[in-house]
Amino acid sequence: MKHTYFYDTLQWTAEGTYYAEEEKSFPLHGEVSILHSETEWSLTGFLEVRFTGEPVRFTNDYVIKDTDKQNTLSWESFNPALGTLKGTFEIVGDSIISFYQSEDGVYMGTETLTQAAEKKYYNAGVSFCRGQKMSSWTAIITADDQGR
């Protein structure tokens, strides 16, 4: 099965659980749009976590580019809370594995998307601040057929 995340222009929705540093869990909801141009791809999205009351929204805008390495994509994103993040997406079988770090080296993390079906991925990730676990999450990400 070929990967559809990144490679197809689709709208994606995520539903799952966000874990704060003390492992307290909260529901999460996210949406992602992926667009392609001749030189790069863009991934724009948000993640909402319902800690208490109104959800807190985290936004990210990624620029994704091919590299000279097979099965490796580079990316850069600006996150209002963390600053500029740079990383790679490594395509490994049915999984897409990402490692990232902030420009100042304070924040880093990893995330894995494992393809379950053509338009469905399982997602798990963890982020760190100065080497200490900051948060983690699990989610199911599905494509919206209306996004085509």
Question: Which functions belong to the PLM regions below?
Answer:
Residues 2-3, 14-112:
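Central antiparallel beta-sheet cores of small beta-barrel/beta-sandwich binding domains
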Residues 110-148:
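Edge beta-strand at a domain terminus
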Residues 1-3, 147-148:
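Short, Lys/Arg-enriched, disordered terminal segments
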Residues 5-6, 121:
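Generic hydrophobic-segment detector
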Residues 8-10:
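A glycine-anchored, Pro-Gly-centered beta-turn/N-cap motif
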